[in-house]
Structures are given as structure tokens and as C-alpha cells.
Amino acid sequence: MSDKQKQLMEYATQDLVAMLVERQGLTLEDAMQRVYHSQLYTKLLDQETGLYLEGSEYLYGLLAEESAVV
């Protein structure tokens, strides 16, 4: 995995955490837990899925769908 791919994954993760804090009023710790324990995060780190190339809004939508199912 290239440094650029790792950086994109990190940025996407940071964006998701920030969006959860801003939109759902979660604490930073709760938002981080939600992201890091999600199926989306596992897929985001898998370079084969290419999810790290998607926009933050799209990823947030996927995370919201995942949370709604649980």
C-alpha cells in the first residue's frame, strides 16, 4: 500500500469522525469508536474496495446506513 493510499484512508476517517461530531452531536471519543468499530472502516482500509477514493459524503451515507441496520 502506498503512502498516498494510507493518507487518503486517514483523511476519510478524520472526515467521518468530524461529521459524526458535527451532525449527530457525538463526543469525539464516541464518534471515533463508531467509525473504528464499523464494517465500513474495515472496508475503507481494504485497498481492493477503493472506498478510500470516495467522497466523505458518500462514506458518511454508507456509515449511516450501516448504523440504521444495527
List each model region and its residues.
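C-terminal alpha-helical interaction appendages
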Residues: 1-70
